[in-house]
Amino acid sequence: MGHNGSWVSPNTSHPRNTSGAQAGANSSAFGELSEAQLYRQFTTTVQVVIFIGSLLGNFTVLWSTCRTTVFKSVTNRFIKNLACSGICASVVCVPFDIILSTSPHCCWWIYTMLFCKVLKFLHKVFCSVTVLSFPAIALDRYYSVLYPLERKISDAKSRELVMYIWAHAVVASVPVFAVTNVADIYATSTCTEVWSNSLGHLVYVLIYNVTTVIVPVAVVFLFLILIRRALSASQKKKVIIAALRTPQNTISIPYASQREAELHATLLSMVTVFILCSVPYATLVVYQTVLNVPNTSVFLLLTAIWLPKVSLLANPVLFLTVNRSVRKCLVGTLVQLHHRYSRRNVVSTGSGVVEPSLEPSMRSGSQLLEMFHIGQQQIFKPSEDEEESEAKYLGSTDFQAKEVLTSSPEGEESQLAPSVPPPGTVDSVSRVSPVAPVEPGIFPDKYSLQFGFGPFELPPQWLSETRNSKKRLLPPLGNTPEELIQTKVPRVSRVERKMSRNNKVSIFPKVDS
């Protein structure tokens, strides 16, 4: 029985082992699918961030180069070209790759042959323009350092160079219409699901990557090395000695300012980020084209989709952060916009109703009147005697107002008696007329019984009653602003100078006849 039991046990345990192996395989496959799905979601999120940041950053670069004159016109043209190509690549490449990364079979119309070829052509063009803009900027930097007092690249030559960049990109991208399964740096989706390898496709991939990617990047590093060598101390010494030996020839001494050094660092950082982010793309091209491996890893494919697009975001970020002059201009412009916006908020426009809770500067619509009012209060502070006299006068006027109110009949409507102006406004000719009758108890300050306030009212120190006050600030030239303005300052007699025969200056005072 034990033998039978031992014999049955392996027979019964074998199906259990096979079912366990199948369950383990299913669980591992499910784990891989879940990891791939999580990585796909991460890829989609990163591409959305790159899309928004690239558009905002490149538009900011365009705005800063158009608004400020930090760099020369030739350098600005190349930077604008790089920013425009980044915007176009972000608009054309990123959205469709986001859709394909989310769900590869969601949009069937993307896989139509005509639409796919046109889309891949635009991908190639904008990617090529972005890469070819790097050596153009490096060439401009090389000439500006080696010949700081000369202009080797004129505006016409820079326009021709930009036209060549776009023509090169278009010519290098035209074969996409003949080859369907072509992947580029910023978009790795293909027009056919089955990868077909051919000799023509291999030749095109090699020629394109050598002429449009590898050679331009090598030229950038070559120019940067030449710039570094020209700025070295030994090379400068040789140039100075040669200039001293041949003074009749004009020899330029290499020079790089702080601004140009920052631009060199920006260019080097851009190219370095581009190379590092393009490593997954290069690996994918080698796998599919050279090694002819059709079934590549999903993780490699997704990494080759999102990682090269980081350079679209890194280019404007590096340009706006590394260059101190650009950063200062950008911050200054933002501060000016903030001041202008806050000033517009302070000055209320469009509504005629004024809230009583607002400050006087907001009620008036301008801060000048409030500043004038504060200045008057600080300069013309009443003395103790003046405060006592004003208090007595206010008490007498309150008593008179009460008598008028008690003497009026009860059946009639009570009308507000015209307030007697204080002594401070008796001689004023330019007093502001009241808009509405004001009760004396609303304004408890020294101007309580004045019906209006304006910048042309006379302070108490200008009036005849307070002429002998110690706090007078003006001489007694008149009582009103008109009299003060009409007073004439005595003319100072001019002194005549005459030259004698001995070249001596004689000064004769002019006598009024």
Swiss-Prot record:
Keywords: Biological rhythms, Cell membrane, G-protein coupled receptor, Glycoprotein, Membrane, Receptor, Transducer, Transmembrane, Transmembrane helix. Orphan receptor involved in normal circadian rhythm behavior. Acts through the G-protein subclass G(z)-alpha and has an agonist-independent basal activity to repress cAMP production. Residues 1-25, 404-432 are annotated as: Disordered. Residues 1-41, 99-108, 178-204, 286-301 are extracellular. Glycans are attached at residues 4, 11, 17, 26. Belongs to the G-protein coupled receptor 1 family. One of its GO terms (biological process) is adenylate cyclase-inhibiting G protein-coupled receptor signaling pathway. Its main location: membrane. Expressed in brain, lung, heart, stomach, intestine, cultured aortic smooth muscle cells and cardiac myocytes. Pfam families: 7tm_1. GO terms for cellular component: plasma membrane. Signal peptide: none annotated. GO terms for molecular function: G protein-coupled receptor activity. This is Probable G-protein coupled receptor 176. The gene is Gpr176. It is found in: Cell membrane. It is a multi-pass membrane protein. It comes from the Eukaryota. The chain crosses the membrane at residues 42-64, 78-98, 109-129, 158-177, 205-225, 265-285, 302-322. Residues 65-77, 130-157, 226-264, 323-513 are cytoplasmic.
